[in-house]
Amino acid sequence: MKKVGILVGREHSFPESIINSINEKGAGKVTAEMITVGGIRMDEPKRWDVIIDRISHEVPYYRAMLKRMALEGTHIINNPFWWSADDKFFNFSLAAKIGVAIPKTVLLPQHEYIKDITSESLRNLEFPIDWEGVVSYIGFPAFLKPHDGGGWKNVSKIHSLEELWSEYNQSGKLCMTLQEGIEYDQFVRCYCVGKEKVLIMPYDPSKPYLSGMQYVDVESYLSPELHKRVEQDVITICKALGYDLNTVEFAIKDGIPYAIDFMNPAPDAELASVGEYNHRWVVDNLTNFILRKLEEGFDTADYRWTAMLNPPEKQASVKAPAAKPAAKTARSKKAASK
């Protein structure tokens, strides 16, 4: 029997729904449960075939534990190694190189540093920042936001250089980006499951986050051509990042979908927040993806240590016995021909 574990934070409806869905569709061959962990031994055996991670970005112990589980062959949704290395500024740069429309973005040095960092530690930094050059490239309005974060935290809309200085001076130790503000005609948020299934949701970011009012029910919101492009851009991004579950947000201006946020490996899927249809869609599609991949096999991440854990001689020793019957058959045929 295969086992799926769910690692959760404060959410309630999504974990319950995905557990019930997997247990129902798994038909006794696959079961799902909430994970319970304590002190993890370095030789901890495999306990789950798949773990759905919803909280390790906020709990370092969970992230370290998931990396250890991955070493035993547990498939983590989403990959804890890449999630640890990932950041939004890199994502913007990568997406632009693979043909996705991205608003102009600049990475800014931090305003403050930990106490052990002195001016001597920062001799490679230009000072002061060429603010005029930054603003000339980005323009206004713009958004000042963390290079690594989510949930619309610490995001400010900027309309002038003076406002930029004021907000930047309050950013503390956060590493920030300044991004061109797209005065959009339409806005969509998209679920992507398994790097292939996409749900495009009309979305109003001006409404309170997690309020349940952001998802707008508008029929035929995008033209068929625009719908196809958005869907393809979502798949392109998620394939490049390797995320099995993600959301991608687009600000659409003059028919061009600009991807403004797509590092969401634990996207909101609460019933009260996203609505019944969207909640059910992500639960059903994630369930189907997991069950299918447990039968077919997940794509294996190629880590540098993989070959060391499975060296060629070890693989050959497993296959070697199969050669003996063939040798006997050959000898018997040769003897018969005499």
Which residues are covered by each model-predicted region?
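A long amphipathic alpha-helix within ATP-dependent nucleotide-binding catalytic cores
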Residues: 210-258, 284-298, 302-319
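ATP-binding N-terminal substructure of ATP-dependent carboxylate-amine bond-forming enzymes
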Residues: 1-77, 81-86, 90, 321-338
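A short acidic/glycine-rich loop-to-helix N-cap element
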Residues: 271-278
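Conserved beta-strand segments of alpha/beta enzyme cores
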Residues: 31-33, 75, 101-104, 244
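Structured loop/turn residues at beta-strand edges in well-structured enzyme cores
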Residues: 46, 100, 138, 243, ...
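Active-site nucleotide/adenylate-binding loops and adjacent lid/helix of ATP-dependent enzymes
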Residues: 2-8, 12, 70-73, 81-187, ...
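Phosphate-binding core of ATP-grasp and ATP-grasp-like enzymes
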Residues: 172-175, 181-217, 231-247, 251-258, ...
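Generic non-transmembrane alpha-helical segments
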Residues: 25, 98, 236-240
